[in-house]
Amino acid sequence: MEEVRCPEHGTFCFLKTGVRDGPNKGKSFYVCRADTCSFVRATDIPVSHCLLHEDFVVELQGLLLPQDKKEYRLFFRCIRSKAEGKRWCGSIPWQDPDSKEHSVSNKSQHASETFHHSSNWLRNPFKVLDKNQEPALWKQLIKGEGEEKKADKKQREKGDQLFDQKKEQKPEMMEKDLSSGLVPKKKQSVVQEKKQEEGAEIQCEAETGGTHKRDFSEIKSQQCQGNELTRPSASSQEKSSGKSQDVQRESEPLREKVTQLLPQNVHSHNSISKPQKGGPLNKEYTNWEAKETKAKDGPSIQATQKSLPQGHFQERPETHSVPAPGGPAAQAAPAAPGLSLGEGREAATSSDDEEEDDVVFVSSKPGSPLLFDSTLDLETKENLQFPDRSVQRKVSPASGVSKKVEPSDPVARRVYLTTQLKQKKSTLASVNIQALPDKGQKLIKQIQELEEVLSGLTLSPEQGTNEKSNSQVPQQSHFTKTTTGPPHLVPPQPLPRRGTQPVGSLELKSACQVTAGGSSQCYRGHTNQDHVHAVWKITSEAIGQLHRSLESCPGETVVAEDPAGLKVPLLLHQKQALAWLLWRESQKPQGGILADDMGLGKTLTMIALILTQKNQEKKEEKEKSTALTWLSKDDSCDFTSHGTLIICPASLIHHWKNEVEKRVNSNKLRVYLYHGPNRDSRARVLSTYDIVITTYSLVAKEIPTNKQEAEIPGANLNVEGTSTPLLRIAWARIILDEAHNVKNPRVQTSIAVCKLQACARWAVTGTPIQNNLLDMYSLLKFLRCSPFDEFNLWRSQVDNGSKKGGERLSILTKSLLLRRTKDQLDSTGRPLVILPQRKFQLHHLKLSEDEETVYNVFFARSRSALQSYLKRHESRGNQSGRSPNNPFSRVALEFGSEEPRHSEAADSPRSSTVHILSQLLRLRQCCCHLSLLKSALDPMELKGEGLVLSLEEQLSALTLSELRDSEPSSTVSLNGTFFKMELFEGMRESTKISSLLAELEAIQRNSASQKSVIVSQWTNMLKVVALHLKKHGLTYATIDGSVNPKQRMDLVEAFNHSRGPQVMLISLLAGGVGLNLTGGNHLFLLDMHWNPSLEDQACDRIYRVGQQKDVVIHRFVCEGTVEEKILQLQEKKKDLAKQVLSGSGESVTKLTLADLRVLFGI
């Protein structure tokens, strides 16, 4: 095949041969590999046949460059493989037909000439002709194995005579033999055995069935070109009564001839295919036969191997063989990395040949025409060291560890074993193991044994520091299934933290192994083309284990007892949740996500879990010395605690402490608030408490992080070199309250909580999904749910928008997440909790004429900026060099567009994405009150919007800068239009303020006992409302970010009391979580937010367990504004969250630039 490139795409073309009846049958054409390309070039290369299936014509050939290889290989496929749906039959090294790189020796020159004939004389090396233009011998060599067996005894006798002649042969003759480039190797016949056949049946099959499975590469290698002709190593087998050893001969310097250490293989038979006289391999074949006879008849012979000069063979310790008595064994060559070779038909062992092992390959320099190239990396070759002696040992047939003597040096030994492990994993990844009778169990067991040996080497004190990168071999083991069937009443179970492994929560190593330098090396290596198959395999196994764990999951009717020491009885749904929590702490990973609707008593449920496990530990009196066994060897914890670390927003730390004091008997649980400037930082003291409560901000402050750790699994994060007591303690349990605070995996808080060490991990949140599926990934990373805590695998296997990804997400949520809503019914048809009625009231408002005029000015300017941005965005495409699918930018900017470039100057107007979103924010403020336009955007409020503006952008973000003029004026100019100054005064009643006051007055007239909660995302809006409430004589209190936690709890208690204030003003971000405002039954949402879950959280401040009155939720929407469009976007986000939490696995909808078009009517 020639090197033909497509003139349009520049890629190598495929060579296509017509095989159907018609005018093009037997003709060949070069065609571009791109589906849409029409490039075709005819050629006169004749038809050739497949090396695997010699009766079938090769219909497709292509030059491909395997990953991590420097030379192209010629891949081919015949019509048989095409009919079977296979990608390729195999590949051979490719060299340009015009190349002049031939061997120096005469015989090698002849071989080179036969291999590198011009394309118009012979098409590729599939049908190699000898120097007399006659068909090659390989077809004759593989047939008639029965005749070979008959002549076996005669050949051995002849071999003795030849051996004597060989001993007398002169050095010059030996040198001539060496010049041919052949390295004699033992040969084997192969046969497929059934697992149940033993004894006489095996012997019988050995006599009759070994012909059809001969390894074709063994034959092919006899006729290769170059000065280093190699053949795949095979092994010979003695009868059970004989003891055989491998032999290596040490020759003199002028006639160095090296034979490979050939371990005995299981059931291999010593049959030799003898070539015809006069064949080009006759002399070398005779020498090989003589050496084999010597190996049989001689006693224990010392096997030595001299170090070879460059250009000679070096041993490739990739695979191994195992001695056992019996008949012939089936053997196969592993497929080329990344390519499915006949679906691995001959690449992997199965139960049909259970007692055999992989082929030991003799690797040659690149370019040797082995059908499958399996050469070592140059660096690996240089590091290999081999012993001078070879000792045969008998091991179990399924052993995955080579039983040849490995290098005594730990460095070389690990390289030696790692090389074997890589090949076996490559074989496993390239094979459809589901098609094998034993599902690939034998190969998996071999990989596990190799990993165990390598794990032992990693822990060895002899290991040098320079070996760290090589020692990090992925660990894989069988899953363990929990078989304990849940009783109708679940007893408390102790934390199973003894003897378990936190790294790889599903007993699988994370898909990403992280080196000390911070770089990641993905599972089974990014460097192989089979990485996709490897990722698919580990993902499927992890999902399968989670799915199987559901078999032991407690049903809806299963409840747990109230723990001793709890003052208040648990409600039915809380008892059911406690049963589920206890079950999850016995699974992998230990812990999960409690995502009950807000107001269902998640705090009390978690307190009950802590109390239950404490009571159980006291009963069993477990020794503290064994508590660290669940930690990874990399974890550096100084103290072990049986306590729980609770991390929550600052506003809730006193709430947690008060709940424990009110709900639990005194002296049952010791609680400590790790907060404030005078906190106790002694790790030994903190480890003695049952509960330690701290805040997200304090954790982020004390635990150092860097941005590169955002995509690294939590188990691999570096925790060294820090003195914070939180990291020095191995906790029994960590609880993240309001866990949506870590929804962005890139922020410091999220990375910091993932570094903490604990046996069980819990994420408690009523809204686990707020924006997109990345929120869910962040929680899984905290839970250390491998392999899904590795970001690249999460994106490729789950968050990929495919149906399969949705199914995987469904399994994850069903296994790890418990979600109940207030309106959910139990098995008897009754609601989970008895709550009063809740009614939503939507108030449609019409802006006043002045307000509408101001709004239209802003809208026109913002719409023009968006149109300009969309034009530039569409023309530029993705030429910015960033991935448009970067999830972190999707979180920051909920429309999936680009991050702001802070280095750019603020244009007038600058049509950046952030600027457009800030203009949208101003439009929403127009709908509330025009006085909001006077102030610059508050950085805290911008953070809630997901916006980050520079100082210059904040000052120029459409504020009424004209108001700063020194000359007093009764009008103000906005974008060329003049408005009255009084429109922007805080005391002026806007449309929404007027409607709000009317509703409040109506509530007071109907019932003086009813109270109201008013929510806004802007603190300035709350100040405006407060002015008007005071003007109308209504008492109020305000909770925003400026109120400290202690004052906040006092204000809540006062509001819930009958004599407290009539109205509570809360900001959406500061007061939207953790507050119990059941004293009020009316809630007013003054403005619209992109994130509907934030509004739902605010609504649940009053609609929760403990509410005695009917609840009314008021929403204000101005007609003809963006608020109407925001309602549509909120529904999209709610649908996304509903699909994920229900585990429906439906396709997810992400917000895009199309939503911006909808908002502005473009």
UniProtKB/Swiss-Prot annotation:
Gene behind the chain: TTF2
Region feature (Disordered): 97-116, 142-358, 388-407, 459-503, 871-890
The protein's Enzyme Commission number: 3.6.4.-
Cross-link Glycyl lysine isopeptide (Lys-Gly) (interchain with G-Cter in SUMO2), sequence positions: 143
Organism (species): Homo sapiens (Human)
Keywords, alphabetical: ATP-binding, Cytoplasm, DNA-binding, Helicase, Hydrolase, Isopeptide bond, Metal-binding, mRNA processing, mRNA splicing, Nucleotide-binding, Nucleus, Phosphoprotein, Spliceosome, Transcription, Transcription regulation, Transcription termination, Ubl conjugation, Zinc, Zinc-finger
Zinc finger (GRF-type): 6-46
Residues reported in the UniProt entry to bind ATP: 596-603
Bias-annotated ranges (Polar residues): 105-116, 219-232, 261-274, 459-485, 877-888
Disulfide bonds: none
Protein name per the record: Transcription termination factor 2
Subunit-structure text: Interacts with CDC5L. Part of the spliceosome.
Protein residues bound to Zn(2+): 6, 9, 32, 37
UniProt similarity note: Belongs to the SNF2/RAD54 helicase family.
Phosphoserine modifications at: 460, 883, 908
Feature: compositional bias, Low complexity: 233-245, 323-338
Described purpose of this protein according to its UniProt entry: DsDNA-dependent ATPase which acts as a transcription termination factor by coupling ATP hydrolysis with removal of RNA polymerase II from the DNA template. May contribute to mitotic transcription repression. May also be involved in pre-mRNA splicing.
A GO molecular-function descriptor: zinc ion binding
Domain of life: Eukaryota
Short motif (DEAH box): ranges: 737-740
